[in-house]
Swiss-Prot record:
MF terms in GO: diaminopimelate decarboxylase activity; pyridoxal phosphate binding
List of catalytic residues: C338
Enzyme class: lyase
Cofactors, names only: pyridoxal 5'-phosphate
Annotated binding of pyridoxal 5'-phosphate, by residue: G223, E264, P265, G266, R267, Y374
Location of N6-(pyridoxal phosphate)lysine modifications: K54
Record's keyword terms, sorted: Amino-acid biosynthesis, Decarboxylase, Lyase, Lysine biosynthesis, Pyridoxal phosphate
Gene: lysA
Catalyzed reactions per annotation: meso-2,6-diaminopimelate + H(+) = L-lysine + CO2
Stated name of the protein: Diaminopimelate decarboxylase
């Protein structure tokens, strides 16, 4: 859950943030490596931890993962290149490519480096088999149901593009091209609960029995939730592992094979390690609503606009005023973009909400919590706004792991 800025449990506290504000001009992202390490250690019972790098794809974060023996999931050619640059080895199981299509350039890359492919469509198997017989593959199965904190994060069922609906149809293709099936994969969406978790683990058992193929691994996918709100409960990792371990043992006994249990977290490993630091540049009254405008928009943090996602917001005064947190004002927090939807306090569907925040003035700072996942990774240049820096806190030091982009760099692509 969001940690108050007066906490002493990690580096994301008021004193450290004030030092960073002096050293690096806002806006910028901050990650605490120690928090990432702690989250990795919570998952050590799984045989393989495979980081969903789409959640936070900075190569310096990937190197942290590599140093802790975390493997990598890539979902694009660019993510394959990031993984290779970060030190992950091809022709092993350190990198797996997961997708529903294989364009020509990506196909040639995975074939050249023998990167295992987690296939979400039958066409992928055919295309891969034609140029790379014997290639190691997984089947991403759509279990015909899904779950998500938003409709847009539901990755199962007939409204989802992800996965293979009839996995039994994949077996003749695999045999025709002499592909090597090594694993089965399921991922039904983000923010899964225990009821759906049990359902998907039972589905994995069902499909493993029906297909009856000699595999070496099953992947539970990702979707592990984190508590974005103070009243959210953290997931019980022991219970999560136990449910999947039962499934693994049943499949292992049926197939007569040792089965490795993989997990593919993204948000769980990095979300709570990150904050977004912004500066207030305007306040205004619009009818009965109080607006505070900061120098980051949905081009930086997309989740509130795209999903109606909640991020806790803290305030640090830019002067020596004393804060009375008991005296709050219902406040709408918005960004600088030329878009009505550039509001951080909204529900899914765009309904504007308010947050109870202290009195805020121009020159104060707003801190968005738990932005380490799907924050910087989803940033864009919309409104021709440059990407902002990323700062990593590690070994009592702060390191710029992505410098501030310039407008000239954006325009150079078009010359």
């Amino acid at each position: 859950m969001p940690k108050p800025l007066n906490n002493t449990e990690n580096n994301l506290n008021t004193n450290r943030i004030k030092d960073l504000i002096k050293k690096y001009s806002p806006p910028f992202w901050v990650y605490d490596a120690d928090i990432i390490y702690k989250k990795i250690n919570l998952l050590r019972k799984f045989d393989v931890i495979r980081f969903a790098q789409k959640s936070c794809s900075n190569i310096n974060i990937l190197r942290l993962m590599k140093n802790k023996n975390v493997k990598i999931d890539a979902v694009s050619l660019g993510e394959i290149e990031r993984a290779l640059l970060s030190g992950f080895k091809p022709s092993t199981n350190e990198i797996i490519f997961t997708a529903d299509i294989l364009d020509e350039e990506t196909l040639l890359k995975v074939a050249k480096y023998k990167i295992p492919v987690n296939a979400g469509s039958l066409d992928m198997l055919k295309q891969l088999g034609k140029i790379s017989p014997g290639h190691h593959v997984w089947l991403r199965i759509n279990p015909r149901f899904g779950y998500g904190h938003s409709k847009k994060t539901n990755t199962g069922g007939e409204n989802s593009k992800h996965g293979i609906w009839h996995p039994e149809q994949a077996i003749p293709i695999i045999k025709k091209y002499k592909l090597k099936l090594i694993g089965l994969h399921m991922h039904i969406g983000s923010g899964v609960n225990y009821l759906h978790l049990k359902k998907v683990s039972q589905a994995m058992i069902k499909y493993a029995f029906q297909l009856n193929q000699k595999i070496s691994s099953i992947s539970v996918g990702g979707g592990l939730p984190i508590p974005y709100k103070f009243n959210d409960q953290p997931i019980d990792i022991k219970k999560y592992f136990m449910l999947w371990d039962i499934a693994r043992k049943k499949i292992s006994k049926f197939l007569g094979e040792k089965i490795e249990l993989e997990i593919e977290p993204g948000r769980f490993l990095v979300a709570e390690s990150g904050i977004l630091i912004s500066k207030v540049w305007a306040t205004k009254k619009m009818g009965n609503k109080n607006f505070v405008l900061v120098d980051v928009g949905f081009n930086d943090l997309m989740r509130p606009t795209m999903y109606g996602s909640y991020h806790h917001i803290s305030v640090i005064y830019g002067d020596d005023r004393k804060m009375n947190e008991k005296e709050t004002i219902d406040t709408v927090v918005a960004g600088p973009l030329c878009e009505s939807g550039d509001i951080f306090t909204q529900k899914e569907g765009g309904t504007v909400q308010t947050r109870k925040l202290p009195t805020i003035k121009v020159g104060d700072y707003l801190i968005f919590h738990d932005t380490g996942a799907y924050g910087a990774a989803m940033s864009s240049n919309y409104n021709t706004r440059p990407l902002i820096p990323e700062i990593l806190l590690k070994n009592n030091d702060s390191i710029v792991i992505r410098r501030r982009q310039t407008i000239e760099e954006i325009l150079n692509l078009e010359k």
